Amino acid sequence: MSKLMRRRTLITTALGVAAGASGIAVAARLANRYGLIPPDNGGVFGIGETLTYAAQRILMSHHSLAREFSRSEISKVAPVNGDLPETETYQRLLHSSFANWRLSVDGLVARPSSFTLEELKRLPSRTQITLHACEMGWSFIAEWTGVPLNYLLRSVGILPQARYVVLFPLDPWWESIDMADALHPQTLLAYAMNGEELPAPHGAPLRLRLPRQIGYKNVKYLSHIKVVDTVKNIGKGVGGANVEDGYSWYAGI
């Protein structure tokens, strides 16, 4: 067994023993030592959220890939969860084909920036055919094209203290992911689906594609990305609007 795997096994075993023998406080301290505390670590299910997140990060490579499919496997139907944003701003942008839309990127970056849709399309892109699994029980396979989030973040200069990327859409929803997922090669800012412009119901003009996590983490209608060292001062401090509604912050599949 390699030194890395021995260390991972030791930490995972210690977390489990701490959870069983001494409860939440000891397990939380141990996970915190290795930077493995998720934002939703408090409350009745906090220890479970912490152990799930910590075990995944310890035992799996940050670059393990979600399965990619062939074009022949693309689903004929791609269901949609939720409605279009009803705000005047979104409706105006939609009717102008997002000509005046911009994605702002700020926070713990060296060069805060903003990008038009056309500017994003001129950046290096990635196309992948992956599964979108919704928390409502359905799924579909689609082809997605967009800018790798890791490329965009590196282009603006991530500062060393950065821990999370917060994603704000053109509606009241928001989500956050850790740097491991933000820098993963399959994490995209997608502007196209199945070879066409991203349809509005699927998140136009830009959505997150995070194929290693469940559907609600794949934020649609993006307008703002903020790099932070903590999410405690955003919303209720638990890492996302879905978490505030009772979902897990880490939703790996």
Where are these regions (language model features)?
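Hydrophobic alpha-helical membrane-insertion segments, chiefly the h-region
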Residues: 20-29
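A general, composition-driven signal for non-globular sequence regions
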Residues: 1-2, 23, 51
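Structured, non-membrane catalytic/scaffold regions adjacent to prosthetic-group chemistry
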Residues: 28-253
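Generic low-polarity alpha-helical segments
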Residues: 10-11, 23, 111
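N-terminal secretory signal peptides and thylakoid transit peptides that target proteins
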Residues: 1-18
